[in-house]
Amino acid sequence: SSHPLENPTFLTNIFECCSILIIPMAMIWALGFYLKRKKFGASIFAVMFFAYIVGVGINTYYEMNGNPAIDNMGIAQENGAMEGKEVRLGAAGTAFWSVTTTVTSNGSVNGMHDSTMPLSGLIEMLNMQINTWFGGVGVGFMNYYVFIIIAVFISGLMVGRTPEFLGKKVEAKEMKIATIVALLHPFVILVGTALASYLYVHNPAFVESEGGWLNNPSFHGLSEMLYEYTSCAANNGSGFEGLGDNTMFWNYTCGIVLILSRFIPIVGQVAIAGLLAEKKYIPESAGTLKTDTATFGAMTFAVIFIVAALSFFPVHALSTIAEHLSLYI
């Protein structure tokens, strides 16, 4: 999406970003409309939009402030970190797009994500690793629905109320399925990255036989491998293109990750819906935990952050965060 015939100006760049988001955003409000629970739809939208705006803010800040390694060479960076970016779109336009394309299963890029600053890469990956904000092609916000089930169950236990969602009891069976679905995503990403890292270190002959994978070893090389599996698992399609990934190893392993992370969660989510549909409707009472409040929205955000985001903290500490510290300290 950086070709001048498609995206010629900063204005068209903003318009295309809004086009990417408009249907996923509208689906959240449609959920509240069809359930006749508009406050519930609004609370979901608020959580997702908050995460999106934070991501846009962080990426824009670091891209507009430039690369300290280039500063140390005495090169002025009035326009920000412009490596891998279109001059007519600028660092801010690329930062905006990079977050927009990763909070949805869009995958298009208008600049090279591999050339963004380390914490910008962290945000891009976290959007896909959390795999919840605004949903994406084919699955919508089904992953957010899983975290709602977990949040309802935990919140109910914390305050001593019966866990209920849309008038249906949430019990152990639904919780087990939701937990498996929530943990599968980090599992396939981290196992794939660990396997690739192990082969790179312990079987260099195999890596060389495939033409060598990494043009950027060390911290950024790990980020490239992590991004590859993250993008596959999230059905995104963007990549850190410094990785030589058009090989037998990457095509087969990424295909396996894509299949597992695409279809197993859908089966689990539909199973939860089926289990809840079979249960008797329970009218709201004084003991019902309300799911359309700001408090529950904050609880859901906390569950998403703890279960999804923190699962990836160790690998980010060795890749994006370590690279950031190497530049700024």
Over which residues does each language-model region extend?
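Membrane-proximal intracellular helices of multi-pass ion channels
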Residues: 1-329
